[in-house]
Amino acid sequence: GRENIKNDSAIREVAKEEVDKLFSLYNEGEYAEIYDLSCDSFKNATARKDFLTVMGTKMKILGEFKGRKLQYSNVINSKSVELYYRVDYINYSLIEEFNYIKNDGQKICLQAMYTDDAGKHGEVIKLH
């Protein structure tokens, strides 16, 4: 009951801090660092060089990160956090989803990220 709610709130805050760290690294072009901080399952699903290419392309198209607003969050089993943001980049504003997980004894890590460039979860707005 109450203990779970407290735990959920705590892990949600940690995940939100991780997203902010990710955006900061993105703006600095430190894509490898984002990759290194991700979960093993993320690394198993995505080769490092592919991730670096995708992030470089994202920077070219979307531009630098400007701001974000949390639209929705969900905590599953007090260890998995889904965060949906409306994210403003220089060129576009769109919805992005981040999934963080805390495995036993491990720090929280990025399990998945999804950029909704097709506008399934919210309008893609061209800013420039």
Predicted regions mapped to residue ranges:
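Acidic-enriched, low-complexity/disordered segments with a strong bias for Aspartate over Glutamate
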Residues: 8, 20, 36, 40, ...
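Exposed beta-sheet edge and beta->alpha loop/turn motif
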Residues: 72-128
